Design a protein with these regions (language model features):
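Acidic donor-binding loop of glycosyltransferase active sites
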Residues: 255-273, 288
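Conserved donor-binding/catalytic core segment of Leloir-type glycosyltransferases
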Residues: 5-7, 174-192, 198-201, 260
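Carbohydrate-associated surface elements
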Residues: 142, 162
């Protein structure tokens, strides 16, 4: 029986977007009666479900890749389909196994780099690997464009991300207290645009500013700068930083706000981009209107006049 083999270096209990995506793909494969197995790293920790269909490979880098490739060659059939979390190194190992391989494309990993290696070695390696895949699955039309730019002969399929509507749904009522409650959630990096949002709130007349509350969820390297900016602009009573939001609390986080806002920007020369913006879809599923910027793949997640 043909199986789907999900090969990924990121899988729960890791918290990254690729980990969550691969977990959801695996879950939906099972619900639709497909035979599926996940091959991932032992360093990801103990599988939350203790699932026998999740195989964790042990080893340091180099040895780890050899063991993964060896496992794929010995424990998969010729007609199995391998779906990889990214094109490298997951995609390379899937391709070397000799099986039919499909690679997920997210956005940032396809942006050009500045170094000699990235310009003249990585560029051609990436082009060949993407072209060699049976298919590349892009999470947005923006990411599809990046794939075609990197590898014009690659077979690209655009499938925007979705959410589980049985899980993401309204769980709490809006506060209706005369205050406009905004929320934002992401890894806190400069390109996410939280500093822009903070400055916009600061620029408002006091009679409007007093009726706004912003709650920012997530951690990251730019958090201290954002906290300092809020303090500098005398917004400590207006803006709160919640830190990491556990999956079990996400629906309440989204549902309790009036509007979800994320002002991601594209900064030339930096390898940062919003390939899709799953948080926008999650927030809308929880009954919260969203505001986003026309950057990266966000237009696929936010439809003007239809929830955003």
């Amino acid at each position: 029986m043909k199986r789907v083999i999900i090969l990924t270096y990121d899988y729960p209990p890791n918290n990254g977007g690729i980990a969550r995506l691969c977990f959801e793909i695996k879950k939906q494969c099972k619900l639709n009666g497909l035979s599926v197995r996940v091959v991932t790293l032992a360093s990801s920790g103990t599988d939350m479900e203790n699932d026998e269909d999740v195989i964790r490979i042990v080893g340091k880098r180099g040895l780890l890749e050899w063991r993964i490739l060896n496992y794929l060659k010995k424990n998969t059939e010729r007609d199995d389909i391998i779906l990889t979390g990214t094109f490298h190194p997951d995609g390379l190992l899937g391709w070397l196994s000799g099986r039919k391989v499909y690679m997920l494309a997210h956005g940032a990993e396809l942006l050009p780099g500045k170094s000699f290696f990235q310009k003249y070695v990585w560029k051609y390696y990436r082009r060949y690997l993407l072209k060699s895949a049976s298919g590349v699955i892009a999470n947005s039309h923006y990411t599809e464009g990046l794939v075609r730019l990197c590898s014009p002969l690659a077979k690209v399929y655009t499938i925007p991300l979705a959410v589980d509507y049985d899980y993401f749904r309204p769980t709490s009522s809006k506060m209706r207290d005369g205050v406009l409650h905004l929320c934002s959630l992401s890894r806190l990096e400069k390109f996410k645009g939280h500093d822009f949002l903070i400055r916009v709130i600061s620029s408002l007349p006091s009679e409007y500013k007093e009726k706004i509350s912003l709650t920012i969820g997530g951690n990251g390297p730019y958090k201290e700068s954002l906290v300092a900016l809020a303090r500098e602009l005398h917004l400590v009573d207006t803006i709160g930083f919640e830190g990491f939001i556990d999956d079990g609390k996400l629906c309440d986080f989204y549902s309790s706000a009036d509007i979800f806002v994320l002002c991601t920007r594209e900064e030339p020369g930096l390898k940062n981009v919003e390939g899709f913006g799953l948080v926008f879809v999650e927030a809308q599923a929880c009954g919260t209107a969203v505001i986003g910027t026309r950057a990266g793949g966000i237009p696929d997640a936010v439809k003007d006049g239809d929830g955003g």
